[in-house]
């Protein structure tokens, strides 16, 4: 492949958001170094202007590209939630050590911007105890990014995502699981009360948020956070009922709300304050109803 003069690094490029982001970057004509655990598998599905590499090879590749190409930014999507491991070392490595390696590369090769991906349940005003190691490590790296932004000529951006959904998400995720239950015509799905308010954000809008910040990187402060969501909340119950009614009009509800006890310190309300993101020229194109309809079209 022929690389353009400017490129970005994307970690977690083979994941849910990463795949959508790569397609959008391709359409924008931006070259990408895409970090993945399985280079051979992803090279077989190569996109134009995308060069796949492993975490072990990223430094050598960036050094090679520095001869005639400029690194303009890094988008860090890769993460470890801790669902499949109880090892704090593994979680710390994925959420702090590896992105710090990328941040050092960004400083060394004078990238303009580092976009870090974070989650709504790690907001500082929440005391969410579920996935605590994930939350601790994400907050740790955010502090490191803030420190680096004060010490170096780079913008560090914390992209705090609300509840992202869309085509291509993992089968074990909440919404794909519910869709699978509906497809299998299960008679009962046990839920909590469903009173939690969430800001469901369609993956296309999330990708556009990253592109908007990347395109306007010269206007971004040295450190800032953008909350990526529609700015409007809906209860889990209303979201699930609309999903079922759209998939199976006229069917009886399969949801048994209140059958599962709420977690301690459950987050009952999370909606993005997206004013500063909108000020950069971004706006969501999908409310939750349009998002559900678009998701079902693309399954």
Swiss-Prot record:
It holds the Pfam family Epimerase. The active site is at 134 (proton acceptor). It is an enzyme of class 1 (oxidoreductase). It catalyses: CDP-alpha-D-abequose + NADP(+) = CDP-4-dehydro-3,6-dideoxy-alpha-D-glucose + NADPH + H(+). Its EC number is 1.1.1.341. GO terms for biological process: O antigen biosynthetic process. Signal peptide: none annotated. Pathway: Bacterial outer membrane biogenesis; LPS O-antigen biosynthesis. The functional difference between abequose synthase and paratose synthase lies in the side of the pyranose ring from which the keto group on carbon 4 is attacked in the reduction of CDP-4-keto-3,6-dideoxy-D-glucose. PANTHER family: BIFUNCTIONAL POLYMYXIN RESISTANCE PROTEIN ARNA, UDP-D-APIOSE_UDP-D-XYLOSE SYNTHASE 2. This is CDP-abequose synthase. It comes from Salmonella typhimurium (strain LT2 / SGSC1412 / ATCC 700720).
């Amino acid at each position: 492949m022929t690389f353009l003069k400017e490129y970005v690094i994307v970690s977690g490029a083979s994941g849910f958001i990463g795949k959508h982001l790569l397609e959008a970057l391709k359409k924008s004509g931006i070259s990408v170094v895409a970090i993945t655990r399985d280079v051979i598998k992803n090279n077989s599905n190569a996109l134009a202007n995308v060069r796949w590499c492993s975490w072990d090879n990223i430094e050598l590749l960036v050094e090679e590209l520095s001869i005639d190409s400029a690194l303009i930014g890094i988008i860090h999507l890769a993460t470890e939630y801790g669902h499949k491991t109880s090892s704090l070392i593994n979680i710390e490595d994925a959420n702090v050590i590896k992105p710090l390696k990328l941040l050092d590369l960004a400083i060394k090769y004078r990238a303009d911007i580092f976009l870090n991906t974070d989650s709504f349940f790690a907001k500082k005003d929440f005391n969410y105890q579920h996935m605590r190691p994930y939350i601790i490590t994400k907050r740790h790296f955010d502090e490191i990014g803030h420190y680096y932004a004060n010490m170096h000529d780079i913008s560090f951006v914390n992209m705090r995502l609300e509840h992202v959904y869309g085509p291509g998400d993992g089968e074990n995720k909440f919404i794909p699981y519910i869709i699978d239950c509906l497809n299998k015509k299960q008679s009962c799905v046990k839920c909590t009360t469903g009173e939690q308010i969430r800001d469901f954000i369609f993956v296309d809008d999330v990708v556009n948020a990253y592109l908007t910040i990347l395109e306007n990187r010269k206007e971004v402060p040295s450190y800032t956070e953008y909350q990526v969501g529609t700015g409007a909340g809906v209860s889990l119950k209303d979201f699930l009922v609309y999903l079922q009614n759209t998939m199976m009009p006229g069917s009886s509800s399969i949801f048994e709300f209140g059958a599962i006890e709420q977690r301690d310190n459950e987050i009952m309300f999370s909606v993005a304050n997206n004013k500063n993101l909108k000020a950069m020229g971004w706006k969501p194109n999908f409310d939750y109803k349009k998002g559900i309809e678009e998701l079902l079209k693309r399954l």
